[in-house]
Swiss-Prot record:
PANTHER family: JAK PATHWAY SIGNAL TRANSDUCTION ADAPTOR MOLECULE. Component of the ESCRT-0 complex which is the sorting receptor for ubiquitinated cargo proteins at the multivesicular body (MVB). Keywords: Endosome, Membrane, Protein transport, SH3 domain, Transport. Residues 381-391 have a biased composition (Pro residues). The keyword Membrane applies. CDD domains: GAT_Hse1, SH3_GRB2_like_C, VHS_HSE1. Residues 215-274 form the SH3 domain. The lineage of its organism: Eukaryota, Fungi, Dikarya, Ascomycota, Pezizomycotina. This is Class E vacuolar protein-sorting machinery protein hse1. PROSITE patterns: SH3, VHS. Component of the ESCRT-0 complex composed of HSE1 and VPS27. It is found in: Endosome membrane. InterPro entries: ENTH_VHS, GAT_dom, SH3-like_dom_sf, SH3_domain, STAM, VHS_dom. Residues 162-181 form the UIM domain.
């Protein structure tokens, strides 16, 4: 006759906290928030609907209900705050948290949300019921709330030394146990009463003393859920077994879990001793029992698939016996699946790291093979054209330092060709008169600056002797040397003014530092064929672009019976009839015939 009034929020709350959801559906949650804000009694009806959902036995429904309540508290203002801080809702939370059948994760979430709501309602003293309920739950269940994360402090040298000492002690204890394990069977057979003592001694190393470093611990078990708040931290849930790798900070270790590596706080885990021999034997026996039931499982499956549906299974003793025998291995099978699933994840992660390392190594190896280091072989740098070369201590042009002849390839002298930079084309210098005497004296006192550098070593030639150079009013026609000794100039260019001295200075046997300025009139002529000594006059100083004086002797006067060779004689001694004598303007009159100087 009298039925409870239907709550308008039951369907909306049930939809937002459905047990079949895989995660929070924020579309449904926001629909509930909008409906609460739109109706006058929306806050009261929504909290009543959530209390019903908290009584559900499904842990997912309980977790979704807590998330819905938190969303309402953040979006619906003081009306929903008052209903959440009511006695009915807080009692429902305490009742669920104190129930032993409630999932541990649900209990932790209740404590977390009550803590958030206490801080949210702290400004209004009328909502103090939530704070009282939170303190009561925290006192009754101290293990629900995870501890605060320790501060990351660098490990000091003393901590490192202590860790090393503990490692050495653990190694010594392990060696002692292995040495004592040898005569154990003989002692057990001769004195059975000593067995309890041996078992006590074997169980003693399982106790982990306080302050143990990561060097002596290989595994830890998580006591609380840990959510990383900074990069590099390891996420885990309560009950996970973490493999310890090393100590990073004073209260933080580095570990590996399900293929992930990161640091974790020590107050969130408990230390686990290494498995003993008995534990390893127990695990091996469990695996043997599981694999021993494979035939029975296959036989049971065959019997059930071949029998007709009308068969009474209860009357068939064989099927019943096989079913009960295989049913006992299911918990062991689930445990082994979890164990080897974790190992598979670890091995898969290790394989991925190895593949990445191998690819990086191969790429670096290919890069180093495709771009080998090039030897730094090059000739010494030459000064650029147009700039004077560095001079020595006595004012002479100083050439580049002589490199090691074994490090560079040098062509044979007869195959070398002298290349000169382009210069401006100069007119035929015949008919020009030398400039005044002071200019010539100044040019003689100061050697011309080097304005170019030949590219190769100049072969030995009689034209290199500066004593063969002369100047006259009439310049004889130029006779070119053989092709293998010809000095090549670019088209439309002539030799720079200082070419003859520069060619002389390029000889390997000649070094400007071997003689002083007093020896300028007689430079060393070693390794040159002896030539007749002739008077030498200074070079004329002309405008830029004038052709340099010839560096060879002119041919004899035409009209002879036989045509003489255009090349100078290499025979030492008296000059021949066709040799050339320099013309001296100071000793000849203006009307003198230049031809009289040919002998």
């Amino acid at each position: 006759m009298f039925r409870a009034q239907q709550n308008a929020f039951d369907d909306a709350v049930a939809k937002a906290t459905d047990e079949n959801l895989t995660s929070e559906n924020w579309e449904y949650i926001l629909d509930v928030c909008d409906k609460v804000a739109a109706e006058e009694s929306g806050a009261k009806d929504a909290v009543a609907a959530m209390i019903k959902r908290l009584a559900h036995r499904n842990a997912n429904v309980q977790l979704y209900t807590l998330e819905l309540a938190n969303a309402l508290a953040q979006n619906c203002g003081p009306k929903i705050h008052r209903e959440l801080a009511s006695r009915s809702f807080t009692d429902a939370l305490l009742r669920l948290a104190n129930d032993r059948n409630t999932h541990q994760q649900v209990k932790s979430k209740i404590l977390e949300r009550m803590h958030d709501w206490t801080r949210m309602f702290s400004s209004n003293p009328d909502f103090g019921i939530m704070e009282q309920a939170y303190m009561k739950l925290k006192t009754q269940n101290p293990n629900l709330q995870p501890p605060s994360k320790p501060v990351k402090k660098e490990i000091t040298q003393a901590d490192r030394q202590k860790e090393e000492e503990e490692l050495q002690m653990a190694l010594a204890l392990s060696i002692r146990e292995k040495s004592d394990a040898g005569p154990a069977p003989q002692a057990e057979s001769s004195a059975p009463a000593s067995a309890p003592v041996s078992q006590t001694q074997a169980a003693a190393p399982q106790a982990v003393p306080s302050g143990t470093s990561a060097a002596t611990v290989s595994r830890v078990r998580a006591l609380f859920d840990f959510q990383p708040s900074e990069p590099g931290e390891l996420q885990f849930r309560k009950g996970d077994i973490i493999a310890v790798l090393e100590s990073v900070y004073k209260d933080w270790w580095k570990g590996s879990l399900r293929g992930q590596t990161g640091i974790f706080p020590l107050n969130y885990v408990e230390k686990l001793p290494d498995p003993t021999v008995e534990e390893l034997q127990r695990e091996a026996q469990m695996e043997a029992d599981v694999f021993g039931q494979i035939k029975n499982v296959e036989k049971l499956l065959t019997l059930l698939s071949t029998r007709s549906s009308e068969l009474n299974v209860q009357d068939n003793e064989e099927i019943t016996a096989l079913y009960h025998s295989t049913l006992a291995i299911r918990p062991k099978l689930i445990e082994l699946i979890g164990k080897y699933s974790q190992k598979k994840d670890e091995f898969t992660q290790l394989n991925e790291k190895f593949i990445k390392a191998r690819r990086d190594y191969e790429s670096l190896l290919e890069a180093s093979m495709s771009h080998p280091p090039q030897p730094q072989y090059a000739r010494p740098g030459q000064p650029p054209y147009g700039y004077p070369a560095p001079t020595g201590p006595h004012g002479y042009p100083q050439g580049a330092p002589q490199p090691d002849p074994q490090r560079y390839f040098s062509p044979r002298p007869q195959d070398q060709t002298h290349m000169y930079p382009p210069t401006s084309q100069s007119p035929d210098p015949r008919g020009r008169t030398p400039p005044a005497g002071p200019t010539m004296q100044q040019q003689q006192q100061q050697p011309p600056a080097e304005s170019f550098q030949p590219m190769h070593h100049r072969p030995e030639s009689t034209y290199d002797n500066p004593q063969e150079l002369g100047t006259s009013v009439y310049d004889s026609p130029v006779e070119y040397p053989p092709a293998n000794q010809r000095f090549q100039y670019p088209p439309g260019a002539s030799a720079p003014p200082g070419v003859h001295q520069q060619l002389q200075q390029q000889q390997q046997e000649y070094s400007p530092s071997n003689y002083s300025p007093e020896d300028t009139t007689n430079p060393p002529t070693a390794n040159f064929p002896p030539q007749p000594q002739q008077s030498q006059l200074p070079y004329p100083t002309g405008p830029a672009g004038h052709q340099a004086p010839p560096s060879h002797q002119p041919p004899p006067v035409p009209g002879g019976a036989s045509k003489p060779s255009p090349y100078p004689s290499l025979t030492p001694g008296a000059p021949s009839a066709g040799e050339y004598q320099a013309y001296n303007p100071s000793q000849a009159s203006a009307s003198s015939n230049p031809a009289s100087f040919y002998r």
